[in-house]
Amino acid sequence: MSATTPDYIEELKQTGDFLTLSRNNEWHLAAGEFTLNNGTVVTIHDTGVIEFQPATVSSKDVVYSSAVHGNETAPIEICDELIKQIIAGELLLKQRALFIFGNPQSINIGLRFVEENLNRLFNGHHSVDGVPMNNERTRAAKLEQYVSDFFSRGEQGSSRCHYDLHTAIRGSKNEKFAVYPYLHGKPWKKSQLQFLLSCGVNTVLMMKSPATTFSYYSSFVHGADSFTVELGQVKPFGENDMSRFAKTKQTLTALISQDKVEYPEFNADEFELFTVHRTINRTQNEFSFPFSDQAENFTGFAKGELLATDGDTPYYADVQGEAIIFPNANVAIGQRALLTVVPMAIDSNFI
């Protein structure tokens, strides 16, 4: 922490506009700290990384990240509003909270990323022998450090959670859905499904292998209840119908401003769960899908229907109802171009 007070502190106290401050300092911002009248300690760790420590002892350490992809604006707007409410003293926290705007430069240019997809660089994938560093790789390494530091300073026995908030490139038959990272054999939690349902998310995709995502990092390294949460479709700033995110914002607010949040009793019938059937990577320059760019996530295919063509290799649906998630024919060679999923039931692997 710098011994001198950064120039931006007084303006931030007045406006609460940490988003604009971060956008004006795309890759670095000097650390700073101040205390609100209600006793909450505000710590700016870097551009896009701000921590709130309530005056009272907390039982949860909560991370909300957005702008890991800079053009996914609805989650950015939600987090911007929450940060402003906290700094204005309108929202009194009961739990420690770390807010992250992942990639401020990509926000400014209105694209998913600048040089490289940030959400392919976590869990150590930012530093690979023979691969030169760039701003996004450096940023991923720093974000891991900030999350590690935040969790390490929590109260002993505190629960840890990280919700990485996104919107999807294309529409979805299930507008909002979450990705539950691979837990390496540990049970899934019904309580987390209840939290997601309270956010307006009743569709959950269960991953079956390690990943390079921010949410997998927090789950695997820190044991956090962690999810990638897709809240709808990508739209420019000012074009989001924020009423569609009211339940999400209310639930995110309650988690950090209440000692304990009560959710409705668990009912398996309220959820649609899917498990990954397979991953299709792009390995050739010539890669295409037979469906249009308007094809929605969770669109199902009949057994034998063409799903993708990678060079001379066709991929056909090999089970009835095999559904597509995150199709993107423009990914870099070697990266995932498509996930396919099949329905699953809530079973004994849930607690």
UniProtKB/Swiss-Prot annotation:
Broad class of enzyme this protein falls into: hydrolase
GO terms for MF: hydrolase activity, acting on ester bonds; succinylglutamate desuccinylase activity; zinc ion binding
Sites where the protein binds Zn(2+): 69, 72, 166
Residues in the signal sequence: none
Biological processes annotated in GO: arginine catabolic process to glutamate; arginine catabolic process to succinate
Domain of life: Bacteria
Hydrolase as UniProt keyword: yes
Catalytic center residues: 230
Keywords: Arginine metabolism, Hydrolase, Metal-binding, Zinc
Keyword set includes Zinc-finger: no
Catalyzed reactions: N-succinyl-L-glutamate + H2O = L-glutamate + succinate
The protein's Enzyme Commission number: 3.5.1.96
Cofactor entry: Zn(2+)
Pathway given in the UniProt record: Amino-acid degradation; L-arginine degradation via AST pathway; L-glutamate and succinate from L-arginine: step 5/5
Family the UniProt entry places it in: Belongs to the AspA/AstE family. Succinylglutamate desuccinylase subfamily.
Record function comment: Transforms N(2)-succinylglutamate into succinate and glutamate.
Protein name according to UniProt: Succinylglutamate desuccinylase
